[in-house]
């Protein structure tokens, strides 16, 4: 007989009772259920527009009772107030919550900018280690004429206002409206006349007196505004002064260093220095020796000039670091440093290279930074390397030149190359065609040659001799079309370029501004045509759309329809418009694709070994 398990009656009944208690649901009256339903609905609406910081669980428990009552009062039916008054009250509450969302956005942007600003100062390793900080700018012997020194602040501001010059910084120099009043010698004036330059441009009116006075400078002006002369003429004058006081002996120098981001720009800057040096020598003044140090040229050419004593060196970062590492060149005497297109060189990719170059200086120097696109994050970071800098801004940083008519056309990817022939019919030569990829440049070049167009091409994959030959042939007018990657977009000055064609849209809007700035230079008119299609990133198209609106250009329908619902959201917050990181007008820093790419790159480099700086590419 099987054994039957027995249970105690009392324990069984208590277990059943516990189970019954667990399943028990208290009865809630209909009126109370309606009330709770109203609270629930109110909370849903409230959570949608909620922007305050989330509370801890304990705070929520404490506030539940009072919050529930408040929600009933706010969102429930009010019999003693009309529906119109209730609607007005709810609208005010929604507006208040919207304002708090804007404040939250601004607070978030401030945090991002602070995290960027917390990087190491842009100084040499020795200066950072010893905590060296220079408090006063370098003093020079140059002074403006007395009648200009005696101008009142109101008169100076009137000149700046007329020329649309914005100046920031302590006690900036007065603006001077003629080269003769800037006390340039006859040789310089002859050199200016030979190039057909009669009066200074706005950036030169304020920039030249500032640099001649020895002040550190951040110069921002649209492409083709004459920034090069602002740093070339003063360094020639300082070198001349040094040569007069004590002539340079063998292997001495340089006094001035100019760093350029590309070989073509370095070559162009060196040729400008040689032009004015020859005119000075023709007037019986000492020879100013300048040296070009860049990849693709034999080091022996630079060594020849350095061995005789060099006053000015124009260099690209890769070759410069190589020469400094090998002690071919020293910066012991260097007191003048200029970085052309500085935003590119201080940008994340080349920041360490610049810091390495700074560490070779042995004393205080006058530092100048120039570019057409200088976002706030670069300006703030660059100030760590400068002493009481003066910032001169002619037009918004990153704005396109008003002399350029911009046209944007939608063309399918497979039809682009053929469509280039139609674009070439719009204007007379010379024409510049830009493409992102080297293979696209080669493809376009080959197609144009097959169609009988006189074209040349340059990109980073070609050797230096071929690049120089192509640029020279295009510059003197032997060739009608130059096809190039962005290597030709920064700072290069080609005479009378009628038309710039963007075969594709660059990755960021700064490159677009540099590209179209090759035309419409020195108060001439130009045309820029950009071909886009579905492969183009929407964030860049939004930036382009807002750039066209800012420049009062025609916006095509396919761009006008782009993201209309986000048109007004948060683009004008606080003092800034658009993104403070990259300068794009179509987004804020919280959605910046460039910042995101930089952060991803930094994250991917975590844990990797640090490569020696002297192996850096000569970009």
Swiss-Prot record:
Molecular function GO labels: ATP binding; ATP hydrolysis activity; helicase activity; mRNA binding; RNA helicase activity; zinc ion binding
Example of a GO biological process term: mRNA splicing, via spliceosome
CDD domains to which the protein is assigned, alphabetical: DEADc_DDX41, SF2_C_DEAD
Enzyme kind, highest EC tier: hydrolase
Species lineage: Eukaryota, Metazoa, Ecdysozoa, Arthropoda, Hexapoda
Positions of ATP binding: 221-228
Compositional bias annotation for Basic residues: 1-11
Keywords associated with the record: ATP-binding, Helicase, Hydrolase, Metal-binding, Nucleotide-binding, Nucleus, Phosphoprotein, RNA-binding, Zinc, Zinc-finger
Stated family: Belongs to the DEAD box helicase family. DDX41 subfamily.
Sequence motif DEAD box, residues: 340-343
Modified residues (Phosphoserine): 11, 13-14, 56-58, 66
Protein name: ATP-dependent RNA helicase abstrakt
A Pfam cross-reference name: DEAD
Organism: Drosophila melanogaster (Fruit fly)
Signal peptide residues on this chain, from the entry's feature table: none
Domain of life: Eukaryota
């Amino acid at each position: 007989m099987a054994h039957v398990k027995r249970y105690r009656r009392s324990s069984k009944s208590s277990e059943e009772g516990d189970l019954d208690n667990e399943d028990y649901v208290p009865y809630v009256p209909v009126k109370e259920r309606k009330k709770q339903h109203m609270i629930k609905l109110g909370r849903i609406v409230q959570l949608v527009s909620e922007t305050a910081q989330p509370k801890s669980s304990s705070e929520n428990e404490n506030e539940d009772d009072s919050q529930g009552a408040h929600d009933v009062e706010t969102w429930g039916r009010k019999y003693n107030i009309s529906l119109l008054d209730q609607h007005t009250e709810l609208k005010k509450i929604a507006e208040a919550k919207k304002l708090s969302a804007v404040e939250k956005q601004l607070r978030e942007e401030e945090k991002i900018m602070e995290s960027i600003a917390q990087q190491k100062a842009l100084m040499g390793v020795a200066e950072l280690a010893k905590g060296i900080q220079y408090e006063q700018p370098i003093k020079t012997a140059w002074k403006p004429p007395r009648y200009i020194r005696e101008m009142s602040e109101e008169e100076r501001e009137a000149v700046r206002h007329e020329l649309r010059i914005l100046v920031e910084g302590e006690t900036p120099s007065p603006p001077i409206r003629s080269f003769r009043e800037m006390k340039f010698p006859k040789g310089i004036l002859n050199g200016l006349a030979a190039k057909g330059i009669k009066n200074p441009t706005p950036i030169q009116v304020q920039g030249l007196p500032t640099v001649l006075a020895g002040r550190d400078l951040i110069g921002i002006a649209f492409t083709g505004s004459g920034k090069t002369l602002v740093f070339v003429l003063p360094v020639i004058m300082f070198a001349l002064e040094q040569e007069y006081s004590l002539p340079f002996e063998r292997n001495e120098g340089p006094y001035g260093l100019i760093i350029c981001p590309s070989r073509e720009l370095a070559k162009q800057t060196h040729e400008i220095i040689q032009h004015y040096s020859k005119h000075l020598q023709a007037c019986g003044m000492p020879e100013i020796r300048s040296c070009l140090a860049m990849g693709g040229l034999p080091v022996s050419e630079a060594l020849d000039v350095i061995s005789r004593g060099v006053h000015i060196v124009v260099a690209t970062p890769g070759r410069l670091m190589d020469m400094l590492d090998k002690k071919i060149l020293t910066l012991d005497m260097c007191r003048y440093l200029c970085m052309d297109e500085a935003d590119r060189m201080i940008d994340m990719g080349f920041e360490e290279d610049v810091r390495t170059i700074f560490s070779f200086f042995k004393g205080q120097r006058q530092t100048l930074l120039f570019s057409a696109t200088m976002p706030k994050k670069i300006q703030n970071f660059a100030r760590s390397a400068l002493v009481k800098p003066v910032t001169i801004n002619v037009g918004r940083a990153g704005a396109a030149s008003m002399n350029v008519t911009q046209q944007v056309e939608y063309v399918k990817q497979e039809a682009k190359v053929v469509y280039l022939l139609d674009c070439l019919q719009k204007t007379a030569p010379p024409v510049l065609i830009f493409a992102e990829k080297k293979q696209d440049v080669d493809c376009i070049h080959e197609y144009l040659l097959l169609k009988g167009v006189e074209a040349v091409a340059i990109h980073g994959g070609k050797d230096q001799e071929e690049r120089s030959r192509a640029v020279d042939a295009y510059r003197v007018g032997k060739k009608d079309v130059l096809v190039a990657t962005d290597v030709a977009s920064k700072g290069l000055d080609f005479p009378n370029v009628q038309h710039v064609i963007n075969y594709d849209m660059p990755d960021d809007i700064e490159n677009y501004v540099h590209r179209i700035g090759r035309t419409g230079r020195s108060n001439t008119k130009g045309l820029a045509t950009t071909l886009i299609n579905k492969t183009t990133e929407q964030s860049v198209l939004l930036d382009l759309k807002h750039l066209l609106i800012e420049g009062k250009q025609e916006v095509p329908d396919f761009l006008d329809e782009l993201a209309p619902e986000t048109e007004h959201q948060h683009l004008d917050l606080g003092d800034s418009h658009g993104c403070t990181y990259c300068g794009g007008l179509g987004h804020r820093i919280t959605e910046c694709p460039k910042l995101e790419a930089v952060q991803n790159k930094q994250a991917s480099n975590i844990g990797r070994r640090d490569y020696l700086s002297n192996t850096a590419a000569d970009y």
